[in-house]
Amino acid sequence: TRSISATGLFLLIMMTVGLYSCTRTQKDIIPSADYAPYVNAYTGGVISQNSTIRIELTHDQPMVDMNNELKNTPFSFSPSLKGKAYWVSNNTIEFVPEEGALKPGTLYEGTFRLGDFIEVDKKLKELNFSFRVQERNFTLQLESLPITATQPNEINIKGDIRFSDVVKKEEVEKMLTASDGKK
C-alpha cells in the first residue's frame, strides 16, 4: 500500500504542477475606461499576421503629415516588432509591421505614447494594450478518388484546402505533394 500512496502522491503533484502551468498563460491587456475621452479604438483581440496596428483618437489632430512615416514611432511592442508608423487620417495612427514580423499564435503587448499627441494626466501618458496573432490552421477536404478501368495508373485528386489566415500561393504549393509510393 505504501507504493500506491507514493504513486498517488506523485500523480497528484504532477497534476497540480500541470494545472498551475496551464493557468499561467499571458493575459490580454485591456486599457482602463479612463482612456475613453481620448481614444475611440485600438487594435486588440485576435488579428491576422498581415494586419496593421491602429490607434484612433477621439479628436482630430491639427497639422498631421498624412501618409508620411513618423520619425519617432509612438509605438513599442513586446516581443519587439520592426515597422513604421503613419498618420492615416487626422485622428488615426497606424503601425505597419515589416512583412512576416507578426508571428502566428504570439501575444503582443503594445504601448502607445498618447501623451505625445494629447495633453493627459501623467497616468494616461502611455496606453497599454495587447493583441494576439491568429494561429495558423488549415482543413483539407478531398472529394472521392475515382479510378477508371481505362486509366488505372492515373488518378485525379480534387479537394478544398482552407486556411485560418492569408497564405501565399507558394507556401501552399510547398505543403502539397503527391507520390505513387515508389522511390
Q: Where do the language-model regions lie?
A:
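Bacterial N-terminal signal peptides that target proteins for export
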Residues: 1-9
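Acidic, low-complexity Ser/Thr/Gly/Pro-rich repeat segments typical of extracellular/periplasmic
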Residues: 22-183
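Bacterial N-terminal signal peptides
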Residues: 8-18
